[in-house]
């Protein structure tokens, strides 16, 4: 039995969908703990591409139960569209469950998100405009609509009549937008409720029962460590906690039941939207990474900013998540490069900096300190073991593992399931050793 968290170790879009899909074959339950339709994951199975935002990747395994947890924010319209897409492709969805305490994204959330971002002008954050931040804001202000409210038409009508009238004042007075018609919105969401009702459960209880039955549970994180509300590049972050601790909160379980945490990182670095990005490449190499890596967002279609691998933020991800091992994705994107750079530290105001600065303005002033490695300039897409890899590619992976001080358990060389090298058992492998001041293992946290 193992309860495993899969976490993005960069700014999201690391390939968590594929890694979760791979690991789901041995999972009894897959849980999506946080985030909303701002997160997208792409899975390719036998040449067929599935693009999902809310539904866990494990849905493609008919025997795997999939849970949308209480820490998520759900846009019912998008969720029903995903369910329809899966059903049209003959993918069973009766193994999907939705937490009754997850919050609901409403039309006014989307309007607030888009209008607020527009008013920021040059100081925009770079949100997806899908209403995620305003939904989480209402959750914190205790004025949000939850799934359990959606299931009670009378209670929903009472809450929404008051809430929409209140939100209309903001729409009209602050943003100069047309008000919403409460009757139309209520009718729309009651219709959504009728369609989603069969899926709604007490998710925390179901997860607890699965733990008691010693089932294998996989927690699928959304976004990435550097987008965490508390530990990311604030204010250029998401509105939830994509780190490992957030998976426990968003699932309704305690941290002591987690056996292992797997971090997912690209062999280079990408970022969507605004915010500091020390290793960003603006020239031909950056464009080459974008083109070869098909770096366009699943949710928005926006071009992702591309740069060299940043081991400083990588080590930070290891620290704040307690990563036990790594999955490195898109190694094949680097196949054509004559040389590859890795950021090992920053220069900040004339000083060498080995740690991620919490202040965004300081982070923006960081200049990467690089170490240059030779490229391999041959295809790795058909490699299925470490022995198949060119020596330079293997050396590159070893260098990343040394810098991150954590082992690499999985190497992904393409979008398909079979384009993968399993280096060590990512689920039942050893826990990461605690190191003394000399870098030697002193104990393990069993």
Curated annotation (Swiss-Prot):
Active site residues according to the UniProt entry: 13, 41
GO biological process, one term: 'de novo' AMP biosynthetic process
Single Gene Ontology MF annotation: magnesium ion binding
EC class name: ligase
Binding positions for Mg(2+) per the UniProt entry: 13, 40
Alphabetical list of CDD domains matching this protein: AdSS
Pathway: Purine metabolism; AMP biosynthesis via de novo pathway; AMP from IMP: step 1/2
Annotated catalysed reactions: IMP + L-aspartate + GTP = N(6)-(1,2-dicarboxyethyl)-AMP + GDP + phosphate + 2 H(+)
Keyword entries, A-Z: Cytoplasm, GTP-binding, Ligase, Magnesium, Metal-binding, Nucleotide-binding, Purine biosynthesis
Enzyme Commission designation: 6.3.4.4
Gene3D superfamilies: Adenylosuccinate Synthetase, subunit A, domain 1, Adenylosuccinate Synthetase, subunit A, domain 2, Adenylosuccinate Synthetase, subunit A, domain 3
Co-factor binding details: Binds 1 Mg(2+) ion per subunit.
This protein's GO CC annotations: cytoplasm
Subcellular location: Cytoplasm
Annotated substrate binding sites: 298-304
Cofactor list: Mg(2+)
Pfam families named among the record's database cross-references: Adenylsucc_synt (PF00709)
Function: Plays an important role in the de novo pathway of purine nucleotide biosynthesis. Catalyzes the first committed step in the biosynthesis of AMP from IMP.
Subunit structure: Homodimer.
Stated family: Belongs to the adenylosuccinate synthetase family.
Entry protein name: Adenylosuccinate synthetase
Originating organism: Crocosphaera subtropica (strain ATCC 51142 / BH68)
């Amino acid at each position: 039995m193992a309860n495993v968290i899969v976490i993005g170790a960069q700014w999201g879009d690391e390939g968590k969908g594929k890694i979760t899909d791979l690991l789901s074959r041995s999972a009894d339950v897959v849980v999506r703990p946080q985030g909303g339709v701002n997160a997208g994951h792409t899975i390719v199975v036998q040449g067929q591409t599935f693009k999902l935002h809310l539904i866990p990747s494990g849905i493609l395994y008919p025997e795997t139960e999939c849970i949308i947890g209480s820490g998520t924010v759900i846009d019912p319209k998008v969720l029903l569209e995903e369910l329809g897409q899966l059903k049209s492709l003959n993918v069973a969805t009766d193994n999907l469950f939705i937490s009754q305490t997850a919050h609901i994204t409403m039309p006014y959330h989307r309007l607030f998100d888009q209008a607020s971002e527009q008013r920021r002008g040059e100081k925009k954050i770079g949100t997806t405009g899908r209403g995620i931040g305003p939904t989480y804001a209402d959750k914190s202000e205790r004025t949000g609509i939850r799934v359990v409210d959606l299931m009670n038409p009378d209670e929903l009508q009472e809450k929404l009549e008051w809430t929409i009238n209140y939100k209309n004042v903001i729409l009209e007075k602050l943003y100069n937008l047309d008000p919403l018609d409460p009757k139309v919105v209520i009718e729309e969401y009651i219709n959504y409720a009728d369609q989603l009702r069969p899926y709604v459960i007490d998710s925390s209880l179901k997860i607890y029962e699965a733990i008691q039955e010693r089932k294998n549970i996989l927690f699928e994180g959304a976004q990435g460590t550097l987008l965490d509300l508390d530990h990311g590049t604030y204010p250029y972050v998401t509105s939830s906690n994509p780190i490992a601790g957030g998976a426990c909160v968003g699932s309704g379980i305690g941290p002591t039941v987690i056996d292992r945490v797997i971090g997912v990182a690209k062999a280079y670095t990408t970022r969507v939207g605004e915010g500091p990005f020390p290793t960003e490449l603006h020239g031909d190499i950056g464009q080459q990474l974008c083109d070869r890596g098909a770096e366009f967002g699943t949710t928005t279609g926006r071009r992702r900013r591309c740069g060299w691998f940043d081991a400083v933020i990588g080590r930070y991800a290891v620290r704040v998540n307690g990563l036990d091992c790594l999955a490195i994705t898109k190694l094949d994107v680097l196949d054509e490069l004559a040389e590859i750079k890795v950021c090992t530290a920053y220069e900040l105001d004339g000083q060498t900096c080995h740690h991620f600065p919490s202040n965004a303005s300081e982070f923006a002033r960081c200049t990467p300190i690089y170490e240059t490695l030779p490229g391999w300039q041959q295809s790795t897409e058909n490699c299925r073991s470490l022995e198949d890899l060119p020596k330079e590619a293997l050396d590159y992976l070893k260098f990343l593992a040394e810098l991150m001080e954590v082992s690499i358990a999985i190497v992904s060389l393409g979008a398909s399931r079979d384009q993968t090298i399993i280096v060590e058992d990512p689920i039942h492998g050893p826990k990461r050793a605690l190191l003394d001041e000399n870098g030697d293992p002193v104990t393990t946290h069993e």
